[in-house]
Amino acid sequence: LLLTADEWVKHVPACRKTVVGDEPYLLFYSLLRPKRAMGVFNQLKELSKRIGMRVAVLTPMAGNAPNCAELINVLEAGPEEFLSLMRHAQAVLTDSYHGTLFSINFHKTFWVYTEGTKEHELGTRRGQVLQELGLTDRIVTDFTQISSDEVKSGIAIDYSAGADVALQSMRGHSIAYLKKSVAYQEN
């Protein structure tokens, strides 16, 4: 979060173009485990039908995703492709800390999926960031909680209502800490 979205785009030219085509998509970025994958893929297919757009699946298990019209299997993606997928997504669904941070940084409509309870999620790194930014309403425990209207509009979150101010404050504290640490090391 030390870099803004504009700084990421400036320094990583590949994220200026899309890697999955021009049609709108929801990005599903997850650290899926094999035992969970098949049930989640079925839920993603249903979500795709409900929201009227394809779901780009970026996960270690993408190769196991069913070959179907609803899902775009992203089998090879390094950091540049990840940034491109994130930047160009209409919305993001993630269970990943970094997926959460980049969704916030790129001002995406997003949801954080947890298999536990919302209360449990608030105790995780993701949950703590969401609390600090006033975005705990983005936690879902079921894909049916994702609003198709929010996905389609892509503007479900008013970042200017407080999240941006909190993010700037967090960024400022982190940079000050790093500068102090470097100065201490030099002495």
Where are the language model's segments positioned?
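Active-site anion-handling motifs in enzyme catalytic cores
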Residues: 1-187
